[in-house]
């Protein structure tokens, strides 16, 4: 009976766990759909800004623009991770990529606190960290933007990189490491072309009427591009997080069902053995009484 009680206790425990993972799966699924929709809808906007900036480079000299200027200073890495776990290998893959690609002796700032302990173990210098609400409020990113831009303009940092989990689809999230500042021509071109826009040919520039002037537009659009680039990065990371969590919780729920099935089979076998032994005892006792 002790063995049967243990099996029943384990079945009950796994059922309780499966109810929790199932509830978390449903919550993550709802958040995932919203986050994926926001990430996908934000891509055309940032690509359009990249295309305008790319064309502006041919109209004026951008080398003196503060956000496109190359200068000395330390390297800064913005690490966009999660505040909570239970999202599969998302954060593990991200920190692995950072260890492989980040410059040596870089300084770090983070959005999300889950990987702060990992950075501490690696003896990395953490300058600041932020936690953002879900769904995202654009105003929450203003302090991050101000920190990066002010430090870069003051030449405390010569390069700013960003590491995040790029959203591909529900099953696939790809770690991404790229330069945020200074803004360079080739990444601008690649970003614009990602939207299916043609940047080649004599007619390419005829798509744009630049008012009031290319210089005024550049001063306005460059900060917009950096800020909304940050917004898009966070949206991509959120879509990746909720997708990974939904998949992880779905897998945990399915594993729980398999475990319950195996334990139920073990319980039935143990019960059958117990009944058989009891029948044998009764039969033996009856024969002894004859």
Curated annotation (Swiss-Prot):
Locations listed in the record = Cell membrane
Domain of life, source organism = Bacteria
What processes does the entry annotate via GO biological process terms? proton motive force-driven plasma membrane ATP synthesis
A Pfam family:
ATP-synt
Question: Does RNA-binding count among this protein's keywords?
Answer: no
- Keywords (A to Z) from UniProt: ATP synthesis, Cell membrane, CF(1), Hydrogen ion transport, Ion transport, Membrane, Transport
> Which Gene3D superfamilies did the record assign?
3.40.1380.10, ATP synthase, gamma subunit, helix hairpin domain
Database matches in SUPFAM superfamilies: ATP synthase (F1-ATPase), gamma subunit
Database matches in InterPro entries: ATP_synth_F1_ATPase_gsu, ATP_synth_F1_gsu
MF-aspect GO terms: ATP binding; proton-transporting ATP synthase activity, rotational mechanism
Q: How does it sit in the membrane?
A: Peripheral membrane protein
Name one cellular component (GO) term.
proton-transporting ATP synthase complex
**NCBIfam families recorded for this chain?**
ATPsyn_F1gamma
Check the record and name the PANTHER family matching this protein: ATP SYNTHASE GAMMA CHAIN, ATP SYNTHASE SUBUNIT GAMMA, MITOCHONDRIAL
Similarity section? Belongs to the ATPase gamma chain family.
Q: State the oligomer form and interacting partners.
A: F-type ATPases have 2 components, CF(1) - the catalytic core - and CF(0) - the membrane proton channel. CF(1) has five subunits: alpha(3), beta(3), gamma(1), delta(1), epsilon(1). CF(0) has three main subunits: a, b and c.
Function in brief: Produces ATP from ADP in the presence of a proton gradient across the membrane. The gamma chain is believed to be important in regulating ATPase activity and the flow of protons through the CF(0) complex.
Q: What is this protein called?
A: ATP synthase gamma chain
